[in-house]
UniProtKB/Swiss-Prot annotation:
Involved in galactan degradation. Part of the ABC transporter complex GanPQS involved in the uptake of galactooligosaccharides. Binds mainly galactotetraose and galactotriose. It is a lipid-anchor. The lineage of its organism: Bacteria, Bacillati, Bacillota, Bacilli, Bacillales. It comes from Bacillus subtilis (strain 168). The keyword rRNA-binding does not apply. InterPro entries: Maltose/Cyclodextrin-bd, SBP. This is Galactooligosaccharide-binding protein. The complex is composed of two ATP-binding proteins (MsmX), two transmembrane proteins (GanP and GanQ) and a solute-binding protein (GanS). A lipid is attached at C23 (S-diacylglycerol cysteine). GO terms for molecular function: carbohydrate transmembrane transporter activity; maltose binding.
Length: 421
């Protein structure tokens, strides 16, 4: 899901779970007294407010406050906050993609959260790291998503699934005939291609010892990245990927081929579970395959979070609400309503959640995933990298030439737009 990726996927993920006991910190009687009569506004994702209905009611009763929930597309909320926040019509708590955190913090749109270590320790390392900027916490993980492998059980059984990407290439050579295909992926986009490139040593940004990103160290054109791109190019060059899945509309073509039973397997995310189910496809879901070097294909973890607006006039109570919404009990309840995989570690073994094949696949793949870089400089990577990979896919440039140009363009844009930080 292109919007989710660059806000970015299903995010789907880090291993997660939760126990039934709520873990939000108790508020003192004086704090409760000061909150009496207050009103908080929460911006929740579209068609997801039912997942927090009970939590909101409980919070209202305990704190004697009114909480108004407004649904907005989570990937667009930061845009609305830029206008509505200063105008006094914005939220106290909002939800947003983890890879937007850095930009939001740089623009002064979010409040730093001050929560106890035991609250932070509830969540998977990757998900909580996505909420950190300069070692400061700006959100609590709500849900995770990452890319996984969907396969059509009527075309290929679980036992027949190739174990490596190279084996999928061989399988596709035998089955693709121009109208039907074996394995498909949107490898002309860095969000998906990074799964292959990083397996051979490529990376987006290098990291310092403290885990922070170094935007001056770009690895999308190193030797490993080029090797991964060369493997990707084979799928297009040999006619195993149709031209229709290249470019902005590629995702629609890829999904249609799968729902029409014309592709045995595709890389997608949990955001398509409902659509594929409604299409009547007899599908299975599993983690991504390995590479020939024995490494697992990685993926970006998309993390949705609860954050406190810098414009909130009741930031202490807003933080209480964010902690409450993201606690163990409420995370599990939200999963039961929305099927979004929570980021709480204990959920990794929760039977109620692990009975879902999609949740199991996201949890397993999350072991090999990394958060989408959340620094503002990431905005300068997407377009040059995607453009380069499209020239690789169409055969207009060799991988090294294309990726060298992408890295050079990204470095120039970072210098021009971010050097004054």
């Amino acid at each position: 899901m292109k919007m989710a990726k660059k806000c970015s996927v299903f995010m789907l993920c880090a291993a997660v779970s939760l126990s039934l006991a709520a873990c939000g910190p108790k508020e003192s009687s004086s704090a409760k007294s000061s909150s009496k009569g207050s009103e908080l506004v929460v911006w929740e994702d579209k068609e997801k407010s039912n997942g927090i209905k009970d939590a909101v009611a409980a919070f209202e009763k305990e704190h004697d406050v009114k909480v108004k929930v407004v649904e907005k597309p989570y990937a667009k909320q930061i845009e609305d906050l830029r206008m509505d926040g200063p105008a006094g019509t914005g939220p106290d708590v909002l939800t947003m993609p983890g890879d937007q955190i850095g930009t939001a913090v740089t623009e002064g749109l979010l409040k730093e959260l001050h929560v106890k270590k035991d609250v932070q320790s509830l969540y998977t390392d990757a998900s909580i790291q996505s909420q950190m900027v300069d070692q400061k916490l700006y959100g609590l993980p709500k849900a995770v998503e990452t890319t996984v492998l969907f396969y059509n059980k009527d075309l290929i059984t679980e036992k027949e699934l190739p174990k490596t990407l190279e084996e999928w290439y061989d399988y596709s050579k035998k089955t693709a005939d121009g109208s039907k295909f074996g394995f498909l992926a949107l490898f002309d986009q860095i969000y998906y291609a990074e799964s292959v490139m990083s397996g051979y040593g490529g990376y987006i940004f290098g990291k310092a010892k403290d885990g922070s990103y170094n935007p001056s160290d770009i690895g999308i054109n190193n030797e490993g990245a080029v090797k991964g791109a060369a493997l990707i190019q084979k799928f297009y060059k040999d006619g195993l990927f149709p031209a229709g899945i290249i470019g902005e509309q590629g995702i629609n073509v890829l999904e249609s081929l799968f729902t029409e039973g014309k592709a045995a397997a595709i890389i997608s995310g949990p955001w398509n579970v409902e659509a594929f189910s409604n299409a009547g496809i007899n599908y299975g879901i599993t983690k991504l395959p390995k590479l020939e070097n024995g490494k697992n294909m990685s993926s970006f973890i998309g993390v949705k979070s609860y954050n406190v607006s810098a414009f909130s006039k009741n930031e202490e109570l807003a933080q209480e609400l964010a902690v409450f919404l993201a606690n163990e009990k409420n995370s599990k309840t939200r999963y039961e309503e929305t099927k979004e995989v929570p980021a709480v570690k204990s959920l990794a073994n929760d039977p109620a959640i692990m009975k879902s094949e999609a949740a199991r696949a996201v949890t397993e793949q999350s072991r090999f995933s990394e958060p989408t870089p959340n620094i503002p400089e990431m905005n300068e990577i997407w377009t040059p990298a995607d453009s380069a990979l499209q020239t690789v896919a169409t055969g207009k440039a060799d991988p090294k030439q294309a990726l060298d140009q992408a890295a050079e363009t990204a470095k120039g844009q970072i210098k021009a737009k971010h050097s004054g930080k």
